[in-house]
From Swiss-Prot:
Keywords, alphabetical: Ribonucleoprotein, Ribosomal protein, RNA-binding, rRNA-binding
Gene Ontology process terms (BP): translation
A GO molecular function held by the record: structural constituent of ribosome
A Pfam family annotated for this UniProt entry: Ribosomal_TL5_C
Membrane spanning stretches: none
Role summary: This is one of the proteins that binds to the 5S RNA in the ribosome where it forms part of the central protuberance.
Name assigned to this protein: Large ribosomal subunit protein bL25
Length: 182
């Protein structure tokens, strides 16, 4: 399950623009790992491996950086890239403790066609995200809401969103409407 999230890395001891250019010429990307309770770690990642996986990542994708001995649980904080050349200059990662729950805003994906809309109603989406709490490796990248059973006059609230057992809703008012059909 997590194989698409694992990236191999190596430490690096040389810094600066010229060293970064040399790394990029070898198809490696210079990167930095930041964390609340750890020192900054300077690393390099194979650009081909990262490019293959990068398109599938979201803001909530938890990655596992592995150097063969140590595995770090991280989010992508920033990617410096040249979009015209499709070239990545540098990556910043943020390390999190895999044993502590974190709160994140997760995208809501709406699937299906609402019965109410088919009957001529208008679908109004009020929220595209929901705040959840989970261990980093249990954090979903998005949640799905099926619109199929929603009729005219119906609404879907935060408490109607189905989450897995290891993910909790972290909103103050779970009766807030996510969408309604008028």
């Amino acid at each position: 399950m997590y194989s698409s999230r694992i990236l191999k890395y190596e430490g690096r001891s040389k810094f600066g623009s010229s060293c970064a250019r040399i790394l990029r010429a070898k198809s490696e990307i210079p990167a930095v790992v930041y964390g609340k309770e750890s020192d900054v770690l300077h690393i390099k990642i194979n650009s081909n491996e990262f490019d293959k996986k990068f398109a599938k990542f979201t803001d909530n994708t938890v990655l596992l950086l592995n150097d063969g001995m140590v595995e770090k649980c991280v989010f992508i904080k920033d990617v410096s890239e040249n979009l015209t050349k499709k070239f990545i200059y540098h990556i910043d990662f943020y390390e999190v403790d895999r044993t502590r729950e974190i709160e994140r805003d997760i995208s809501i994906k709406f699937i299906g066609a609402s019965v109410g809309v088919k009957e001529g109603g208008t679908l109004s989406v009020l929220r595209n995200t929901v705040k959840v709490k989970a261990l980093p490796l249990n954090l979903p990248e998005f949640v799905e809401v099926d619109l199929t059973p929603v009729k005219k006059g119906d609404q879907i609230t935060l408490k109607d969103i189905v989450l897995s057992d290891n993910v909790k809703l972290s909103e103050t008012d779970e009766n807030l409407a996510v969408l309604f059909v008028k």
